[in-house]
A protein has these predicted regions:
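Phosphate- and other anionic-substrate recognition elements at nucleic-acid/protein interfaces
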Residues: 1-133
């Protein structure tokens, strides 16, 4: 989970996210990167900030990896539980079961990242939307 100092300006925080994602990609050299598509957020300010951060993530992924796969919340729920309306707790329990963990991963963002990775593994990455070689 990437965190940034709350006392930094938003543009600096975005730059820190880009640098952190780039460093992770350079360190682990993934062949592919999977991300969750943005969902509607009732808080407009939060939604816009999340969209900016997501854009930085996508830019780093395409620029440094080349293969980016995106999954909708519905695709993730169906892949993990077989039910498109599963709630967050049900999905987290499936992560715990799939990975043989004694408890649900914390923080929630870590569990969310694992859900996306498991969805990508489960679907075989057949939904790629972007590919740059």
């Amino acid at each position: 989970v990437i965190t940034t100092p709350k006392d930094e300006s938003f543009p600096v925080r975005l730059a820190l996210i880009y640098e952190s994602v780039t460093k992770l990609i350079e360190t682990y050299k993934p062949d592919e990167i999977a991300a969750e598509e943005l969902f509607f957020n009732t808080n407009i300010t939060t939604g816009i900030n999340v969209a900016h951060a997501r854009g930085v993530l996508l830019l780093a992924a395409i620029h440094h990896c080349g293969k980016l796969y995106e999954y909708t919340p519905l695709q993730i729920k169906q892949a993990m539980t077989g039910y498109g309306r599963a709630d967050k707790k049900q999905i987290q329990q499936m992560v715990k079961v799939y990975l043989g963990l004694s408890s649900v991963p914390k923080p929630d963002d870590a569990a969310d990242a694992l859900v996306v990775a498991l969805t990508h593994i489960q679907t075989g990455g057949f939904t790629d939307k972007f590919y740059i070689q």
